[in-house]
UniProtKB/Swiss-Prot annotation:
<feature type="repeat" description="PPR 7">
    <location>
        <begin position="318"/>
        <end position="348"/>
    </location>
</feature>
<feature type="repeat" description="PPR 14">
    <location>
        <begin position="551"/>
        <end position="585"/>
    </location>
</feature>
<dbReference type="InterPro" id="IPR046960">
    <property type="entry name" value="PPR_At4g14850-like_plant"/>
</dbReference>
<keyword id="KW-0694">RNA-binding</keyword>
<comment type="subunit">
    <text>Interacts with MORF8/RIP1, MORF2/RIP2 and MORF9/RIP9.</text>
</comment>
<feature type="repeat" description="PPR 5">
    <location>
        <begin position="248"/>
        <end position="282"/>
    </location>
</feature>
<dbReference type="GO" id="GO:1900865">
    <property type="term" value="P:chloroplast RNA modification"/>
</dbReference>
<dbReference type="Pfam" id="PF01535">
    <property type="entry name" value="PPR"/>
</dbReference>
<comment type="similarity">
    <text>Belongs to the PPR family. PCMP-A subfamily.</text>
</comment>
<feature type="repeat" description="PPR 13">
    <location>
        <begin position="520"/>
        <end position="550"/>
    </location>
</feature>
<feature type="repeat" description="PPR 4">
    <location>
        <begin position="222"/>
        <end position="247"/>
    </location>
</feature>
<feature type="repeat" description="PPR 10">
    <location>
        <begin position="419"/>
        <end position="449"/>
    </location>
</feature>
<comment type="function">
    <text>Required for proper chloroplast development. Involved in the regulation of plastid gene expression probably through regulation of plastid-encoded polymerase (PEP) dependent chloroplast transcription. Required for RNA editing of several chloroplastic transcripts, especially accD transcripts. Required for processing of the chloroplastic rpoA pre-mRNA. Required for the monocistronic rpoA transcript processing from the rpl23-rpl2-rps19-rpl22-rps3-rpl16-rpl14-rps8-rpl36-rps11-rpoA polycistron. Binds the intergenic sequence of rps11-rpoA for rpoA monocistronic RNA cleavage.</text>
</comment>
<feature type="repeat" description="PPR 12">
    <location>
        <begin position="485"/>
        <end position="519"/>
    </location>
</feature>
<keyword id="KW-0934">Plastid</keyword>
<keyword id="KW-0677">Repeat</keyword>
<dbReference type="GO" id="GO:0009507">
    <property type="term" value="C:chloroplast"/>
</dbReference>
């Protein structure tokens, strides 16, 4: 957020004459270097004093005014002929409380019939600085004339305190008044507004006006890069970044963060290296963005180098940097390093504790996650929704049903049981612990059931051997208009395979094809397993052969399908083909083929299959 600077009059304090029991400064104004110094004007205001020999400000007592009512008669406290707008603007900038701001405003209303615009601008900016947006808006609305600085100050004030809707409404009024876009700070405010509201088309129009007017400096161009990055327009962000004659840490961080968020981790790492080569030291936001890229790309070695840079260059290691480091190590499978970072952090908040609990739960260390959660509770830290989801997953992974039910009771007490993510995880927990009835009750009580909650129920029933219930839930899900995801298809096809429900399996195959889900390797593997389990090996191979991508699961499903249906030679051929394409044949596959091919000469079968594979190659 780029804050507006106040308009400062050129003042010079020349002497401080003593009048009665208080001091009153003599202010000299210099409007032009070619003119002579104007006559000194003595201003008599109580409590005015010189601060550090440089600026004038109000004494905290300021007993000359008896109230904050702007209509109150205080004419006895000052001489209106000796008060100047420039002096009042200077006092506004020196004031540290709204009480003084209102008194200065009252003085201006009493001394002058008309307010000049720049005094009103300073008054608005001072109110914004002290957080009184209501009074700032009253001043704004009461100004008979406004310029671009006036509108900018008010819009910037709303943005500063997160009131994007009010800022946007004010901008619409700005456009209706037909004021031209000429102020660089206004462009910065509008780009920040468009960034927060993801108003891409409006932001592009602002960009067009920037080009038309010819506005451009480092802050404006960085705001433009940040706007495109926040709207997910990576190409436009990079184009705007490349056109910058001068770059700063903010612009580098914006493009690195955009690359990381859009899944271009390698590109983000390359940009980060370029930033260092241009001698820019990253800040904590840059570090968090590049660590996210390392997490997604599993770039552990580079992540360690970033960690070393943070330590050596003494980059601010707040909870966000520490949490990003923990997340990077956890997603790269280095739980011990993740725990070391956690233990070395001097400050930990709910986000930090949630991150370490989620990391242990995700990597299968459920007991450790539960232990950390108990420590967190003893330290009286309030868990958020993500903490609850993580600890429920930890309970499910180790079968801690009792603790899960305790958490469920606490969830109901805190009135968060209708949260779809918490509800879906509760469904998964109860299914994992064999409590399908409790899982169904949770599902029924959810006000809106999304694909995650339905999939949790279907997967749970399928794993528990309740195939017919799983398929009924799939039917109900589709009737409610919820589109299945690849995990839903895989779970439902597993239920079809276990119950050998070929007709339903074919229907699911048709739906998956219609929704373009067949390209997913897990859906393809589940289809192979279903057709092979139902005895339709040729259809299983047709699915296998049409898969654009194969993994170990799909190879294994097809080989097992051949072997269990008595097609030993085909199984052996496929095993050799699998090995030739770089996949390791595990002992389970080999043992299955040996056990099912006992009625043929194995050496002859192996030799013929190998020869056949070499010929086809």
């Amino acid at each position: 957020m780029f804050s507006l600077s106040l308009i400062q009059p050129r003042l010079r304090i020349s002497e401080i004459p003593v009048t009665q029991s208080y001091k009153s400064p003599t202010i000299c104004y210099s409007s032009d270097s070619r003119t002579k110094r104007e006559e000194q004007r003595h201003v008599r205001l109580p409590g005015f004093r010189l601060v550090s020999g440089k600026r004038a400000s109000f004494d905290s007592g300021f007993s000359g005014f008896k109230g904050e009512n702007v209509n109150q008669d205080d004419s006895s406290s000052f001489d209106s002929e000796r008060v100047d707008y420039a002096l009042l603007a200077e006092w506004l900038q020196s004031s540290n409380g709204m009480r003084l701001i209102k008194r200065i405003h009252a003085m201006a209303l009493k001394c002058f019939d008309d307010q000049v615009i720049y005094f009103g601008n300073n008054l608005i900016s001072s109110c914004v600085r002290l957080g009184d947006l209501v009074y700032a808006r009253k001043v704004f609305d009461s100004m008979p004339e406004k310029n671009t600085v006036t509108w900018t100050a008010m819009i910037d004030g709303y943005l500063k305190y997160g009131l994007e809707d009010e800022a946007f409404a004010l901008f619409e009024d700005y456009v209706k008044h037909g004021i031209r876009f000429t102020n660089e700070r206004m462009f910065v405010c509008l780009l920040n507004l468009c960034s927060r509201r993801a108003e891409f088309e409006l932001g592009r129009q602002v960009h067009g006006n920037m080009v038309k007017v010819g506005v451009g400096n480092l802050i404006v161009e960085s705001s433009l890069v940040y706007f495109y990055a926040q709207c997910g327009e990576l190409t436009s962000a990079l184009r705007a970044f490349d056109m910058m004659e001068e770059k700063d840490v903010i612009s580098w961080t914006a493009v690195i963060s955009a690359c990381s968020r859009k899944g271009h981790g390698i590109k983000a790492i390359g940009m980060f290296i370029g930033m260092l080569n241009h001698w820019f030291l990253p800040n904590e936001f840059t570090v968090c963005s590049i660590l996210k890229a390392c997490s997604e790309e599993k770039a552990l070695r580079f992540g360690r180098q970033v960690h070393s840079l943070v330590v050596k260059r003494m980059i601010k290691t707040d909870v966000f940097v520490g949490t990003s480091l923990m997340d990077m190590y956890a997603k790269c499978g280095e739980i011990s390093d993740c725990r070391k970072v956690f233990d070395g952090m001097s400050n930990r908040n709910t986000v930090t504790w949630t991150s370490i609990i989620a990391a242990h739960a995700r990597e299968g260390f459920g007991e450790e996650a539960i232990s950390l959660f108990r420590i967190m509770k003893r330290r009286h830290l309030i868990a958020n929704n993500l903490t609850v989801v993580s600890i429920l997953r930890a309970c499910g992974s180790v079968g801690a049903l009792l603790l899960g039910k305790e958490l469920h009771a606490q969830i109901i007490k805190n009135s968060i049981e209708k949260n779809v993510y918490i509800g879906s995880t509760l469904v998964w927990l109860y299914c994992k612990c064999g409590e399908s009835r409790d899982a169904f009750n949770v599902l029924q009580q959810l006000p809106s059931r999304d694909v995650v909650s339905w999939t949790a129920m279907i997967s749970g029933c399928s794993s528990l051997g309740h195939e017919s219930e799983a398929l009924d839930f799939l039917k109900e899900m589709i009737q409610e208009g919820v589109e299945p995801n690849p995990f839903t298809y895989s779970s439902a096809l597993k239920a079809c395979a276990n119950s050998e429900s070929l007709l339903i399996g074919r229907s699911i195959h048709s739906i998956a094809k219609k929704n373009h889900a067949l390209s997913n390797v897990f859906v393809g593997s589940a289809l192979i397993h279903m057709y092979a389990k139902c005895g339709f090996v040729s259809e299983a191979f047709r699915v296998f052969d049409s898969m654009p991508e194969k993994n170990l699961v799909s190879w294994k499903a097809m080989i097992m399908g051949y072997a269990r249906n008595g097609f030993c030679r085909e199984a052996l051929k496929l095993m050799y083909r699998m090995e030739a394409e770089g996949f390791e044949v595990d002992d389970y596959i080999f043992a299955t083929i040996l056990s099912t091919c006992g009625d043929i000469e194995l050496d002859e079968a192996v030799e013929s299959s190998a020869t056949c594979y070499l010929e086809t190659s």
